[in-house]
């Protein structure tokens, strides 16, 4: 049995295979760009889906039913509404049936079911099981028709009335609490929190940066909003142990505090690819051939309920666009700011983006182009300003001096004149 278990979980089937894996494994587990270790299928199964649900199934869980029943309140809050209603209906009906049987037994033992008996009954007008069941419903729901009532003939009957009233209050409190907790769950708040379809890698302040965009579709704020990210990939340790999902934190400004965001308009989250980044040694070619997943998480408190919500998404390696930037979505109008969500997922290619890794860029192995080249965001802002000026009757010749033959998706060496531009909200 021990040998079978060893073969089942061992990644190395023989000493020769172990030597091959040891020679192919490198730091960070990505490979050297020329050859890549494939210990699993080429196409990675997404660990976190785009909608935030985790693609995980639990099997062979011992005593699962007992564990779920031990935490029955959380179980009722997590299950679907239809099952929740079924459980609550059963709770009421079973409690009515149980106490109806108790009152029927009391009447039976006391002889109240005998119509010829003239002595005082424990519960008046309870001479059948149906009558006992109706009395149980009237007692627990406090309907009080006044036709059936308990007498002082049997102390046990009085005790059962008191006990059923307490049980009914407990059931009502449990149901109301579970329903309110389920209705107040901030899970649906995630429907109005969105991530961009693709992440991008581009230059930002002279450094390669991984970026993705988040947005809030509601006007209500997300209090204490902050972001974090993790890179998931498989790797083999120096001892030959295979780790299917090694989790590596991606720094998005936790130390400096810029991971906390004011999410009123869409914001671009920036991860600077430095020597501490797991992407430091990866070039564009390595990214194209890599097999990893970046899980991004947005957390905050719902303003209406003060309950914490968490919105998740993920990006596979083939969903990271190298040398792209996001189109601007925030524009300054005369008395307000306008957010155009039709541009939220759109990107454009930035020419002259280094194709090398951040390490090669830091070691001056790649010569950067002119940093003052014309940017597409500026062209979009100027174009939008021209449209506003033309609507306000401003002559076209005074709006901008930008040459008309500039391509919106290409950079040109045209200096910008100082003028108030529309700005995108980014960190």
UniProtKB/Swiss-Prot annotation:
Q: Catalyses which reaction?
A: K(+)(in) = K(+)(out)
The GO annotation for biological process reads: cardiac muscle cell action potential involved in contraction; magnesium ion transport; potassium ion import across plasma membrane; potassium ion transport; protein homotetramerization; regulation of heart rate by cardiac conduction; regulation of membrane repolarization; regulation of monoatomic ion transmembrane transport
Residues on the membrane's Cytoplasmic side span 1-81, 179-427
Give the keywords, sorted.
Cell membrane, Ion channel, Ion transport, Membrane, Potassium, Potassium transport, S-nitrosylation, Transmembrane, Transmembrane helix, Transport, Voltage-gated channel
Superkingdom: Eukaryota
Listed under GO cellular component are: membrane; T-tubule; voltage-gated potassium channel complex
| Membrane association type | Multi-pass membrane protein
Q: Where is this region: Disordered?
A: 384-427
**GO terms for MF:** identical protein binding; inward rectifier potassium channel activity; phosphatidylinositol-4,5-bisphosphate binding; voltage-gated potassium channel activity involved in cardiac muscle cell action potential repolarization
Q: Which residues carry this modification: S-nitrosocysteine?
A: 76
Question: Where, by residue number, is the motif Selectivity filter?
Answer: 142-147
Any transmembrane segments, and where?
82-106, 157-178
Q: Which Pfam families match?
A: IRK, IRK_C, IRK_N
- Quote the Gene3D superfamilies the UniProt record gives: 1.10.287.70, G protein-activated inward rectifier potassium channel 1
Primary place of residence? membrane
Q: Site described as Role in the control of polyamine-mediated channel gating and in the blocking by intracellular magnesium, positions?
A: 172
Parts of the chain on the Extracellular side = 107-128, 148-156
Q: Where is this motif: PDZ-binding?
A: 425-427
Q: Which family does it belong to?
A: Belongs to the inward rectifier-type potassium channel (TC 1.A.2.1) family. KCNJ2 subfamily.
State its role. Answer: Inward rectifier potassium channels are characterized by a greater tendency to allow potassium to flow into the cell rather than out of it. Their voltage dependence is regulated by the concentration of extracellular potassium; as external potassium is raised, the voltage range of the channel opening shifts to more positive voltages. The inward rectification is mainly due to the blockage of outward current by internal magnesium. Blocked by external barium or cesium. Probably participates in establishing action potential waveform and excitability of neuronal and muscle tissues.
Name assigned to this protein: Inward rectifier potassium channel 2
